[in-house]
Amino acid sequence: MGCAPSIHTSENRTFSHSDGEDEDVDVDVPGPAPRSIQRWSTAPGLVEPQPRDNGASKVSVADVQFGPMRFHQDQLQVLLVFTKEDSQCNGFHRACEKAGFKCTVTKEVQTVLTCFQDKLHDIIIIDHRYPRQMDAETLCRSIRSSKFSENTVIVGVVRRVDKEESSLMPFLAAGFTRRFIENPNVMACYNELLQLACGEVRSQLKLRACNSVFTALEKSQEAIEITSEDHIIQYANPAFESTMGYQSGELIGKELAQVPINEKKGDLLDAINSCVTVDKEWQGVYHTQKKNGDNIQQNVKIIPVIGQGGKIRHYVSIIRVCNGNNKVETTTECVQTDSQTDNQAGKHKDRRKHSMDAKAVSSRTSDVSSQRRHSSLARIHSMMIEAPITKVINIINAAQENSPVPVTEALNRVLDILRTTELYSPQFNAQDDPHATDLVGGLMSDGLRRFSGNEYILATKNLPPLSNNLATPVSLHDVPPRIALAIENEEQWDFDIFELEVATQNRPLIYLGLKTFARFGMCEFLQCSETTLRSWFQMIESNYHSSNPYHNSTHAADVLHATAYFLSRDKIKETLDRIDEVAALIAATVHDVDHPGRTNSFLCNAGNQLAVLYNDTAVLESHHVALAFQLTLENDQCNIFKQMERNDYRTLRQSIIDMVLATEMTKHFEHVNKFINSINKPLTAQESEEPDRSLEDIKAMLKTPESRALIKRMMIKCADVSNPCRPLEHCIEWAARISEEYFSQTDEEKQLDLPVVMPVFDRNTCSIPKSQISFIDYFITDMFDAWDAFVDLPNLMQHLDDNFRYWKGLDEKKLRSLRPPPE
């Protein structure tokens, strides 16, 4: 990946300056290669001064010492981001040449992220003086959103102001490391670069080196635990967690348990304390308990680590499980510690009486679990022990104890799977279809996922804006004939929503909604007038964006139609209560209200206020349902809930919220798999045993609140993405609309220099058939198979098969368009 033509890179060379202001200063900082130059003897790790070489200003590189680790710093790279090459830009450019740093200059904001990801500069200097020409803080956030920028130093050049300074918090919150008050003097810029190189850059280099240390700890077969001076667990490697039976990360931040010690162990604690409090490591054998309560014998080495102020700041415990045949004998020894610390100024002088006896070691020296009292870890166990997943893990741990090696290894793999956070989400490996993998990841993630695509340019009609020429109907008896004809067969699955869209001038929701709600007796249940319901529909539809190709009121009407169709199926009518039907129809109506035509990932990457408000979690879904209730409740003329009893309203509200949140794709596989395991499989099992006797059991099982919630979530999910199950022409039109909306998002991401969440939806490189095939394969088929098994929807499944064959046929012909070329 290369940089744009406007970016110029200086070659690595030594420059001589005879200018009076460019006085030669020779400092040991990260540079091109070791040379014979003068260095400051006062700086740590620098050699003695040497004679100047004809006044030439040179900078050399030095090895960096980090504890016992020593590594080499490559030539430092600097990226200058200025909209114009003024004196300040030139000052930094000349300073880079003077220091021998590689320098890249870019004047085009849209090329910055690409250039940075290509070169991975150590320092980025951004011009923050002219916000109208360049939004420096947004650019900085964009850079920080890249995983490669974690150790990059970003400097903002600001104006020199005479008035009182304001807080730097917004500046730092944007991701800047420090600021530089404008000063075009070359030596001022040079000195700034030297300070950065010897300070922040070197510190970041050491932090990067920590990755290798943590890798060694993570892969070590020895169990290692690190605690603070107050015995708060700061780190436990996988070997430790596996040895003690804990889940990954479960112990971090927890205080070690305070456990009563029996009399036989008192001498052991005294021996440990006598060692560690005088900066000596202790090594010996003692007993401890695993999470499941089993006692194990361990060979333990406890090492105190001296830190700031010459005091003990950490304890490192290295543990090996002893062979079960060993005798229970405790042997201890003190060894003078020679571990490297971050402060060698002095030894530990503060011998705290309670350094280990009540916390770190005491939790490991108890032989009887009944002696446990109200310690922090015991409280944690009491909270978690009732969790079903914890019970499963404990049972598997117990089964491993006396199992053969192959069985133990297989159970370990089972535990690894159970300990993942996404138990219901599929995991893809390198052999999977990259296109499908990227599509699935992009639709299910609030973070960044990369896609690939093929060539395609969509030619679709521009939808006209919402028209006000069509009068709002006073009642269902006041509907114009053309619209009445368009909604005549709305109870049928093959109902043409696009015909209604044209007839209503892009206002299908209010007309379809009034008829559907009347069919289900919504006004009677809500105890509201048809006038109130009509005003509510008008208000909701006006908050859908008609400018969106896909997420507009036509999509809402389509989802409402599908939901009503599902509610009319016999199995659903037998299962759901009246309030469930009402909740489902309202949820379908409002499920995408005020949708901006952009994905959750886009809003999170752009720092949108909704993403901030909802903590980057289910951003749009939370907004849709919250806004729907806000708009409804703040206006009496639209408040369809006004006459409801308090308890009924709260039940209805909770059900609506639950259904709208279920449309978030990050939980797709969780909802589908729960439905299969909790509804489909029990039904199949009961029906196959004794059909007559199990009929009542089946009804009772389906009527539970948990089962009804699963069914309602599945219903709105299927209604929301039912496009591939519609007649072919409808399916093609929906594919065109969603593709155009995603194309528009990709265009805007590139324009704003944001991470491109779905590169597969580039209007110049997209294969619509491939995207539809992947979507059907990974999201639609299994879900509708499960839904069909419960509801019985043969017509939908036939459409799904026909549409899949259509897209497959286009793809096999290497076509990227919506339709084959005319013959």
Curated annotation (Swiss-Prot):
<feature type="modified residue" description="Phosphoserine">
    <location>
        <position position="382"/>
    </location>
</feature>
<feature type="modified residue" description="Phosphotyrosine">
    <location>
        <position position="456"/>
    </location>
</feature>
<feature type="active site" description="Proton donor">
    <location>
        <position position="551"/>
    </location>
</feature>
<keyword id="KW-0597">Phosphoprotein</keyword>
<dbReference type="InterPro" id="IPR035965">
    <property type="entry name" value="PAS-like_dom_sf"/>
</dbReference>
<feature type="compositionally biased region" description="Basic and acidic residues">
    <location>
        <begin position="10"/>
        <end position="19"/>
    </location>
</feature>
<protein>
    <recommendedName>
        <fullName>High affinity cAMP-specific and IBMX-insensitive 3',5'-cyclic phosphodiesterase 8A</fullName>
        <ecNumber>3.1.4.53</ecNumber>
    </recommendedName>
</protein>
<dbReference type="Pfam" id="PF00233">
    <property type="entry name" value="PDEase_I"/>
</dbReference>
<dbReference type="GO" id="GO:0007165">
    <property type="term" value="P:signal transduction"/>
</dbReference>
<comment type="similarity">
    <text>Belongs to the cyclic nucleotide phosphodiesterase family. PDE8 subfamily.</text>
</comment>
<feature type="binding site">
    <location>
        <position position="555"/>
    </location>
    <ligand>
        <name>a divalent metal cation 1</name>
    </ligand>
</feature>
<comment type="function">
    <text>Hydrolyzes the second messenger cAMP, which is a key regulator of many important physiological processes. May be involved in maintaining basal levels of the cyclic nucleotide and/or in the cAMP regulation of germ cell development. Binding to RAF1 reduces RAF1 'Ser-259' inhibitory-phosphorylation and stimulates RAF1-dependent EGF-activated ERK-signaling. Protects against cell death induced by hydrogen peroxide and staurosporine.</text>
</comment>
<dbReference type="InterPro" id="IPR002073">
    <property type="entry name" value="PDEase_catalytic_dom"/>
</dbReference>
<dbReference type="GO" id="GO:0019900">
    <property type="term" value="F:kinase binding"/>
</dbReference>
<dbReference type="GO" id="GO:0071364">
    <property type="term" value="P:cellular response to epidermal growth factor stimulus"/>
</dbReference>
<dbReference type="GO" id="GO:0030295">
    <property type="term" value="F:protein kinase activator activity"/>
</dbReference>
<dbReference type="Pfam" id="PF23198">
    <property type="entry name" value="PDE8A_N"/>
</dbReference>
<dbReference type="GO" id="GO:0047555">
    <property type="term" value="F:3',5'-cyclic-GMP phosphodiesterase activity"/>
</dbReference>
<dbReference type="GO" id="GO:0004115">
    <property type="term" value="F:3',5'-cyclic-AMP phosphodiesterase activity"/>
</dbReference>
<feature type="domain" description="PAS">
    <location>
        <begin position="209"/>
        <end position="280"/>
    </location>
</feature>
<feature type="domain" description="PAC">
    <location>
        <begin position="283"/>
        <end position="325"/>
    </location>
</feature>
<dbReference type="InterPro" id="IPR023174">
    <property type="entry name" value="PDEase_CS"/>
</dbReference>
<feature type="modified residue" description="Phosphoserine; by PKA">
    <location>
        <position position="355"/>
    </location>
</feature>
<dbReference type="InterPro" id="IPR023088">
    <property type="entry name" value="PDEase"/>
</dbReference>
<keyword id="KW-0114">cAMP</keyword>
<feature type="binding site">
    <location>
        <position position="720"/>
    </location>
    <ligand>
        <name>a divalent metal cation 1</name>
    </ligand>
</feature>
<dbReference type="InterPro" id="IPR036971">
    <property type="entry name" value="PDEase_catalytic_dom_sf"/>
</dbReference>
<feature type="binding site">
    <location>
        <position position="592"/>
    </location>
    <ligand>
        <name>a divalent metal cation 1</name>
    </ligand>
</feature>
<feature type="domain" description="PDEase">
    <location>
        <begin position="475"/>
        <end position="814"/>
    </location>
</feature>
<keyword id="KW-0378">Hydrolase</keyword>
<comment type="subunit">
    <text>Interacts with RAF1. The interaction promotes RAF1 activity.</text>
</comment>
<dbReference type="InterPro" id="IPR003607">
    <property type="entry name" value="HD/PDEase_dom"/>
</dbReference>
<dbReference type="GO" id="GO:0006198">
    <property type="term" value="P:cAMP catabolic process"/>
</dbReference>
<feature type="region of interest" description="Disordered">
    <location>
        <begin position="338"/>
        <end position="373"/>
    </location>
</feature>
<dbReference type="Pfam" id="PF13426">
    <property type="entry name" value="PAS_9"/>
</dbReference>
<feature type="region of interest" description="Disordered">
    <location>
        <begin position="1"/>
        <end position="55"/>
    </location>
</feature>
<feature type="binding site">
    <location>
        <position position="591"/>
    </location>
    <ligand>
        <name>a divalent metal cation 1</name>
    </ligand>
</feature>
<feature type="binding site">
    <location>
        <position position="592"/>
    </location>
    <ligand>
        <name>a divalent metal cation 2</name>
    </ligand>
</feature>
<keyword id="KW-0479">Metal-binding</keyword>
<dbReference type="InterPro" id="IPR000014">
    <property type="entry name" value="PAS"/>
</dbReference>
<feature type="modified residue" description="Phosphoserine">
    <location>
        <position position="452"/>
    </location>
</feature>
<dbReference type="GO" id="GO:0070374">
    <property type="term" value="P:positive regulation of ERK1 and ERK2 cascade"/>
</dbReference>
